[in-house]
Amino acid sequence: VPKNWENTFFNWMENIQPWCISRQLWWGHQIPAWYGPDNKNFVALSHEDAKLMAKKHYGKEVELKQDEDVLDTWFSSALWTFSTLDWPDKTYELERFYPGNVLVTGFDIIFFWVARMMMMGSHFMKETPFRDIYIHPLIRDEKGQKMSKSKGNIIDPLVLLDKYGADTLRFTLTALLNPGRDVKLAEERVKGYKSFTNKIWNAANFLNLNDVKFIDQIDTETINLDSSKWILKEFEEVQKKYFENIEKYQFHEIASLVYHFTWHTFCDWYIEFIKSDFKDPKKSDETKKISGWVFVQTLKLLHPIMPFITEKLWLSLVDKDSFLMSQNFIKVNFDKSFDNSKKYILKIIEILTSLRNLR
């Protein structure tokens, strides 16, 4: 993923060339080969094993000298997926974690690393090491040029972190992560998404001031308000698309979904609709439950992209004794009768939007 990188992979594999795996460096894995007095080599797991092999060959103990070269780093890293799990021993870790689900990497090492891991895994484990391979784009400057010291166009992430926070930078990069296209990063984009972070925080404060019940479970049988049914159906649709896009690795679509729902649907419209309901005895209890529940579920959708602010709000408002990162998503499927309320509210929004545009 994206599919266009398949051609790059297969082009290299179909035109494969001999590979010299030895390097003359002072770091790396020393080649496990020992040489006898007549330069016969003995490949073994250890010096002791090589000595036993040599003794069997020569009929006596002889002095062995290990090859001074080291393995090419791409050879060593090609074994990474199973060598780190104590292969060739059949350990629990090897059984549990091989093969992996997905590898995330850059296009520039598809051949150097990805293809070689595939080859090694297929040969030694009889199974490829990954189900999916996600090729992420490069981050360039706002003009699309590659960052370099000589050009003076390097964007220091530490500076952005200090000015706008980790969550804002994470969300910005996710929103710009369109498969097949390099990211054109400008500080103004990060600055713009800082407003989104503030919007989430302000929404939480507003709800908390109105004694909203930040709950993780609701009883849909007792829901009567059109505003409640509408926002629940809106959330259901967003959540469905959210999981669909996760399966397709469309992370920019996920960011767009949660951004639009949180800022526009929830904050701009829903909160405005329910402000008076907090003071209405007939509507207050349901409004506090539904608004709190939807906000909590929205935090879950935001958490993979913005872990710090969402975790802080969860611990402060929902449950100080558990972490949001350990919670499960609650996949919803609300009653179809809620669709009538959704159509009704959307019609109101359409009318109000038209009136605003007349100003």
What are these language model-derived features?
Residues 1-35, 145, 151-196, 201, ...:
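Residue patterns forming the tRNA-binding/recognition surfaces of aminoacyl-tRNA synthetases
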